[in-house]
């Protein structure tokens, strides 16, 4: 039955007086935490079944039919909770899912953003099928075995259990947590303290190529005080974190060419140019072994880390040594510089390399072409367009004729070195929100009370998200609230969610929806 959110008392939205605010805030937080926990423990089988049903639908953005099935199911899930939900459509692009709860008397409005699409999969790399949700007693790396989904509340499942499926952590967990927070509030007889606007993106993993147009077309729906970008993992220490920025991103597919046909390496080696060697030398000219980018002008627009940002980084619990140990790394780049500091810098990542064959597929030939795939992570003041120009010019300076077209024999005959560059159509710049703004302090306060201790606060996450669009079009600050476990195999095979992270996420969103409108935003 659809629920109507009508305020019957001002207590849900009125801020307590200054003398009582601290005590009242703690009591409210404890009460909401208990309510969320009570709801969850009484409904675990139903929660996990609903989550599994959502995870069972393939969700690669290019699979339009299944993306639509995801969107339709989300509409059903939202409407069942009293959310006024609809699809925001733009041609044949994956629809964005929108919904809102407008609370009479609420003075603050929050957009909750997440994405319902996931990364493409190579099914053969998964222990169990990526869209056949599987519950395990613990992580695969720790020897976890498959267990049955609970069928009644007496069947207790450990918080260390893992749910394996594509998008279990990235990013359907956040969608589930925020919708279940509505259930927890309703079950406890409470009302949201804020107006809520949900926005679920259907092609974030494809670079959100249509999101800007959707925001512009439906801009009137999105008046708000802040947008919480609900994506990403917890800190590697296992603590809750809040992040106030993202790095930008752009992608490149690069191909260099040798002879028009594969040549016998004995008859033509040391004479015919080897495309694999050409490509690896070109890559070495772009980046050194410590991650420093050698492309001229790449760092010209990069601002130094501010004193406030350095202070935030210094306050982060040290995790680098433990991470190196768990990942089997004797050293990390930049003379073992802290991870949080390295995420403040731009990066060039080699995603893949392909030419010839290895092992049983090796042949004594000189490959006709060699291919590499890159992503570039950008920081504020850098734009994808400028980075593309710098990279193209760098390749030319290495003696290459650069084209984005198909390479012909005439091109090979006319130029000693030929490179085809194919830049991804998506991509976006970095974005940051002040960590000291009133809205930042309000969100930090509520999350602190929810967790019982201060969250880790960082200027940026290492990954990328289209948050600049929200700042550019909607003129709202963006704060990132991740809930997934840091070892969730995000974007990789055997993606998973630790159940305790979902349980904690429900409590966090219950606090935010239930209390954010009643704390001091000054």
Predicted regions and their residues:
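Extended, hydrophobic alpha-helical segments in both membrane/secreted and soluble proteins
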Residues: 196, 214, 228, 443, ...
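Bacterial N-terminal signal peptides that target proteins for export
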Residues: 1-6
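Short glycine/serine- and small hydrophobic-enriched flexible loop segments
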Residues: 180-187, 281-285, 376, 511-514
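Acidic/His- and Gly-rich active-site-bordering loop/insert found
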Residues: 21-168, 187-194, 374
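Short, solvent-exposed loop/turn segments at the edges of secondary structure
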Residues: 107, 128, 193, 223, ...
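Acidic/histidine-rich catalytic neighborhood of metal-dependent amide-processing enzymes
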Residues: 155-245, 520-522
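Hydrophobic h-region of N-terminal signal peptides that target proteins for export
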Residues: 10-18
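Metal-dependent amide/peptide-bond hydrolase catalytic core
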Residues: 20-26, 31, 235, 251-496, ...
